[in-house]
């Protein structure tokens, strides 16, 4: 009898916790959520002809310049690299608005090309 009462109590507790966590309101759109941050840098020089714009992610744990390619891929780069500095000084390369996302994107080299591994 004590075992079934304990099991029933545990089940009720789990249901209460689960329903409470599901009823939590989502964060309103106007709340400033973390912008896209990078976990590591793309190590190679990205061909300039592939880049259509860039974003800054400088307030992250790993500061980065995120280049956006013609295929709408985002490539995390080291803002201290000479080639990155050269690209962002190009007046024909627009600074794009920061995206407010709580996700982290990881870019790595695969077959010499940038590859998006995790996008949302």
From Swiss-Prot:
Disulfide bonds: 37-60, 38-76
UniProt GO BP: antimicrobial humoral immune response mediated by antimicrobial peptide; cell communication; cell-cell signaling; chemokine-mediated signaling pathway; chemotaxis; eosinophil chemotaxis; inflammatory response; positive regulation of cell migration
Record has Disulfide bond as a keyword: yes
The keyword Ion transport is annotated on this UniProt entry: no
Location (main, coarse): secreted
CDD domains xrefs: Chemokine_CC
Subcellular localization, as worded in the UniProt entry: Secreted
Induction (free text): By IL10/interleukin-10.
UniProt-listed InterPro entries: Chemokine_b/g/d, Chemokine_CC_CS, Chemokine_IL8-like_dom, Interleukin_8-like_sf
Signal peptide: 1-23
Keywords carried by this UniProt record: Chemotaxis, Cytokine, Disulfide bond, Inflammatory response, Secreted, Signal
Any Pfam family: IL8
Molecular-function GO term, any one: CCR chemokine receptor binding
GO cellular component: extracellular region; extracellular space
Superkingdom of origin: Eukaryota
Distribution of this protein across tissues and organs: Mainly expressed in liver, also found in spleen and thymus. Highly expressed in LPS- and IFN-gamma-activated monocytes, weakly in some lymphocytes, including natural killer cells, gamma-delta T-cells, and some T-cell clones.
Family to which the UniProt record says this protein belongs: Belongs to the intercrine beta (chemokine CC) family.
Cited function: Shows chemotactic activity for lymphocytes and monocytes but not neutrophils. Also shows potent myelosuppressive activity, suppresses proliferation of myeloid progenitor cells. Recombinant SCYA16 shows chemotactic activity for monocytes and THP-1 monocytes, but not for resting lymphocytes and neutrophils. Induces a calcium flux in THP-1 cells that were desensitized by prior expression to RANTES.
Protein name (record): C-C motif chemokine 16
Source lineage: Eukaryota, Metazoa, Chordata, Craniata, Vertebrata
Gene from which this protein is expressed: CCL16
